[in-house]
Regions:
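C-terminal beta-strand-rich structural cap/linker in extracellular carbohydrate-active enzymes
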Residues: 419-460
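Carbohydrate-binding surface patches
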Residues: 358-408, 443-447, 451-453
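C-terminal outer-membrane/trafficking sorting elements
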Residues: 633-678
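Substrate-binding cleft and catalytic face of glycoside hydrolase catalytic domains
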Residues: 63-240
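Extracellular ligand-binding interfaces
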Residues: 495-603, 608-626
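Short carbohydrate-recognition loop motifs
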Residues: 482-502
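Aromatic/acidic polysaccharide-binding cleft in carbohydrate-active enzymes
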Residues: 270-372, 378
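Noncatalytic carbohydrate-binding groove/subsite architecture in carbohydrate-active enzymes
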Residues: 182-297, 301-303, 307
Length: 678
C-alpha cells in the first residue's frame, strides 16, 4: 500500500509538472512587427584609458551594434583625450590623436558614430582655474564656432561616414553639465551647428542631448526660425520609462516640419542611479532579463533610429558606478553584455511567437538558415516551458540553448567570463517542426537557436560602396506608421506598411564608389492591395554631377507602379524619374548603375527604396550586393515578339507618340529600353 501511494504521488507530481509547463508556439513563416534591427548601440564615456580600449573594444564585434556614442568632454582636462583644444582663444591649436584613436577603433566595429561636441574648452572658459569651468558658456563664440568646424573637418578626414554630432551633453542638467540658461544653449547651438555642416556637409547634427524633455520644442522653434540645420533630436533616460522623452521629441519634430529628422536616445539604462551602483542589479544576471524587457518598446518606434545603451565599459574614477556591459577592472563581459550578444545572434526578421499565461515574455526571428527564440522571466519563480517551432525553412541543423541566470553566463555571480552554451544537439526537425522543453530561472533568460547545417554568417559585412549618409522619412510619427530601415553593415533594407493601407515607406542610401552592377535580392511577406494612383513598390537611383547637384534618375519596378505617378522624392533630383524601367522580378535583378549614369557623374548616388499605398501588413526586404552584367536581359526585338510598348519623355512622363524613352515589354517577360529620337 505504501509503495502504491508513492507511485501515485509521483504520478501526481509529474502531472502537475506537465500542467505547469508554459506552451510557447513559434511560427517561422509569419513575419511580425517590429523587426529586430540592431539599432541598440552603446555609449562610451571618456572615463577610460587606452589599455581598456585595446582590451574591450574588439568585444564590440560580437554585439552587432550599429552605433557607438562618445562624449568628448572638452574642458575636463583630466579625462581621456583631453585637452584636445590648446593654444589661446584667438589662436587655438589641436591635439586629436587620442580622440581619433578611440573613434577609429569604434568605427571598425560600429558603422555609425555619435559624437557629442562639448563642453567649453579650457581656452574659452571664464573660470579656467576651476574644475567646474567646463560648464560655463564660451567666452568667445567665434572661436567656439571655429572649434566645431575644425572637429567636423577632422571627422571628415578620418572618414567617419554615416555619423552624427550632438551639440553639448545634458545642458538642461543645471550645474551638472551647464551653468547657462536655455537661451544660452540655443546660442551655443546656433553658432556650432552651421559650423559643423560647413566642416563636414554629410554628417548629421542635432541636440539637445537632454537629461530631461524640456528643451526639444525650443530647439526646434529656434532651428525653424533661423533656418539652422537640425537633423535629429536627442535625449536621455535612466529608468524603465523612456516614453516621456520620445513623446516630447515627436511633438517637437512634428512642429519642425522636417520629415527626415530622427530621434536618438543617446543615453539609456533601465536602472536609476541608486540601482547601478556596485553590487546592484545592473551587475547581476537579472540585467539580461531587464535588457530584453526593454527591447520591444524601443523596436516599436521606427522613428527612434539609434539607442545608446549606458554604458559600454564601466566608467573609471567613480568607484561605485558600475552600469557598464564590461567590468572595468577585469575586462570580463557581464550578464548584460551576454544579453546584447544573444540579441546580436537573432535574425532581424521577426516572426510570430505566442506564449501561454501572463508571466513569460519572448521574441522570435527567422532567416533562411537560422531560427531563434528568446524567452525571459520577470517573475521570482522558475518557469518551465514546452516550445513548438513550425514552418522551419530548412531540414537539418543543430539545436542550441543558452541560459543567463545566477548560475550561468553571469560573471557577477559565477566569476566565469566564458560564454557557455547549455545544450547543443542535432535538431529533430520533422515536417518543418521542432519541439523542445526547457526552463527559465527567476529573472533569467533562455535563448533557443536552430541553425542549419549550411548556415552562413548572419550579418556579413557587405562591401558594396561607402555609405555617406542615410535619408530617413517619417511623415507619420506614430508606432503604427509605415517605415523603411537600412542596415549599413549588410546593405539590407526592411520596409513595412505596418498598419497603414496608404502609407509611404521610404529610405535613401547616399553612397559613393558603387560597382557598375548591383545585384538586388528581395523577399516579401503579406498580400498587397493597391490603393489610389500613387501606389508603388520600386527602387530608384539618383546620380550626382560634379556640381554637387543631383541631375538624373532612373526608377526600376516589377509592375507595382503607375506610369502616371506624380510623387517626387524629398531628396535627389526632387522630381519624377527621368527613366522608368520595368524588370521581370524586382526580387531578383541587376541594376546596371554605369549604364544610366550621366556624362558629368561624380561617383555619388542616392539609392532609394520606395513602397507606397499597397495595403497594410505588407513587408518587403531588399538586400544589395555586387552584381554582374549576366543578370541583365535585353534581347533585340524581332517581329511578333513585342507585347507592349510605352513611351516616356525624359522627365518620366508617359507619351502617346514614338519620341523619348521607349520601354518595350516582350512576350517572354523581359524588357528593353530604347531611346527614340524625333
Amino acid at each position: 500500500m505504501k509503495q502504491f501511494s508513492q507511485i501515485l504521488f509521483g504520478l501526481l507530481m509529474l502531472t502537475q509538472s506537465a500542467q505547469a509547463q508554459v506552451a510557447v508556439q513559434v511560427n517561422c513563416s509569419q513575419w511580425e512587427e517590429y523587426p529586430l534591427v540592431k539599432k541598440i548601440g552603446v555609449y562610451q564615456t571618456p572615463l577610460v584609458n587606452k589599455k581598456w580600449l585595446d582590451r574591450d573594444f574588439p568585444k564590440l564585434e560580437d554585439l552587432e551594434a550599429r552605433s557607438m556614442r562618445y562624449e568628448m568632454a572638452c574642458g575636463k582636462d583630466d579625462l581621456y583625450g583631453q585637452p584636445c583644444v590648446l593654444g589661446t582663444a584667438k589662436r587655438p591649436t589641436y591635439s586629436m590623436t587620442d580622440v581619433d584613436y578611440l573613434l577609429t577603433l569604434a568605427k571598425k566595429y560600429t558603422p555609425s558614430l555619435i559624437i557629442a561636441h562639448g563642453y567649453t574648452p579650457t581656452i574659452l572658459q571664464s573660470r579656467p582655474d576651476e574644475w567646474a569651468g567646463f560648464m560655463d558658456t564660451p567666452t568667445d563664440y567665434d572661436t567656439w564656432s571655429a572649434i566645431n568646424k575644425r572637429f567636423a573637418r577632422e571627422w571628415r578626414s578620418k572618414k567617419y561616414t554615416n555619423s552624427y554630432v550632438e551639440i553639448w551633453n545634458e545642458p538642461d542638467l543645471k550645474d551638472g553639465f551647464f551653468t547657462g540658461t536655455l537661451d544660452d544653449y540655443l546660442h551655443i547651438y546656433e553658432t556650432a551647428a552651421p559650423a559643423v555642416i560647413e566642416g563636414y556637409s554629410d554628417i548629421k547634427v542635432g541636440g539637445p542631448s537632454g537629461a530631461f524633455n524640456w528643451w526639444h520644442q525650443a530647439l526646434c522653434d529656434r532651428a525653424k526660425q533661423k533656418g539652422l540645420p537640425l537633423d535629429f533630436l536627442s535625449g536621455h533616460t535612466y529608468g524603465p520609462d523612456y516614453s516621456g522623452q520620445l513623446n516630447a521629441m515627436r511633438a517637437a519634430l512634428n512642429s519642425l516640419g522636417n520629415n527626415e529628422a530622427e530621434m536618438l536616445l543617446t543615453e539609456y539604462s533601465p536602472y536609476t542611479p541608486a540601482e547601478y551602483q556596485a553590487d546592484g542589479p545592473v551587475e547581476k544576471a537579472e540585467a539580461a532579463m531587464t535588457f530584453f524587457n526593454a527591447l520591444p518598446g524601443m523596436l516599436a518606434c521606427p522613428d527612434l533610429t539609434h539607442v545608446s545603451w549606458a554604458q559600454y565599459i564601466d566608467p573609471g574614477f567613480f568607484v561605485g558606478d558600475k552600469l557598464g556591459l564590461i567590468d572595468r577592472d577585469s575586462g570580463a563581459p557581464k550578464a548584460l553584455y551576454n544579453a546584447f550578444r544573444l540579441y546580436g545572434m537573432m535574425p532581424a526578421d521577426r516572426c510570430q511567437i505566442n506564449i501561454g499565461g501572463n508571466v513569460l515574455q519572448g521574441m522570435a526571428s527567422v532567416a533562411d538558415d537560422c531560427v531563434t527564440a528568446v524567452v525571459w522571466n520577470p517573475s521570482t519563480t522558475e518557469q518551465t516551458f514546452n516550445m513548438t517551432l513550425t514552418n522551419i525553412p530548412f531540414k537539418t541543423g543543430t539545436l542550441e540553448v543558452w541560459h543567463i541566470d545566477e548560475t550561468e553566463n553571469s560573471w557577477y555571480e559565477t566569476r566565469k567570463s566564458t560564454f557557455t552554451v547549455s545544450r547543443s544537439e542535432p535538431a529533430t526537425i520533422n515536417l518543418k517542426r521542432q519541439q523542445l522543453s526547457d526552463f527559465v530561472r527567476s529573472k533569467g533568460v533562455c535563448f533557443v537557436r536552430i541553425k542549419s547545417d549550411e548556415a552562413k554568417p548572419l550579418f556579413p559585412t557587405t562591401r558594396l560602396g561607402t555609405v555617406v549618409r542615410t535619408h530617413q522619412w517619417f511623415p507619420n510619427r506614430t508606432n503604427e506608421a509605415s517605415y523603411a530601415l537600412f542596415d549599413p553593415k549588410t546593405w539590407t533594407v526592411r520596409m513595412s506598411s505596418n498598419q497603414e493601407a496608404t502609407g509611404w515607406a521610404l529610405v535613401g542610401i547616399e553612397a559613393e564608389r558603387l560597382p557598375d552592377y548591383i545585384q538586388v535580392n528581395g523577399k516579401r511577406n503579406g498580400s498587397m492591395r493597391r490603393s489610389g494612383s500613387n501606389y508603388a513598390l520600386c527602387l530608384r537611383i539618383d546620380y550626382q554631377a560634379s556640381t554637387g547637384e543631383y541631375v538624373h534618375s532612373v526608377l526600376f519596378h516589377g509592375g507595382v507602379y503607375r506610369d502616371t505617378r506624380t510623387t517626387v522624392l524629398p531628396w535627389g533630383t526632387k522630381r519624377v524619374p527621368d527613366e522608368v524601367v520595368r524588370v521581370d522580378n524586382l526580387n531578383d535583378f541587376v541594376i546596371p548603375v554605369a549604364e544610366h549614369q550621366p556624362a558629368d557623374f561624380n561617383g555619388r548616388v542616392i539609392l532609394t527604396c520606395d513602397m507606397a499605398s499597397i495595403g497594410s501588413g505588407v513587408k518587403q526586404n531588399f538586400q544589395f550586393s555586387e552584381g554582374t552584367p549576366t543578370g541583365i536581359s535585353t534581347p533585340t526585338p524581332t517581329a511578333g515578339e513585342v507585347q507592349e510598348e510605352a513611351f516616356y519623355d525624359l522627365t518620366g512622363r508617359r507619351m502617346h507618340h514614338a519620341e523619348g524613352l521607349c520601354i518595350v515589354r516582350h512576350t517572354d517577360g523581359s524588357t528593353q529600353k530604347i531611346y527614340v529620337p524625333r
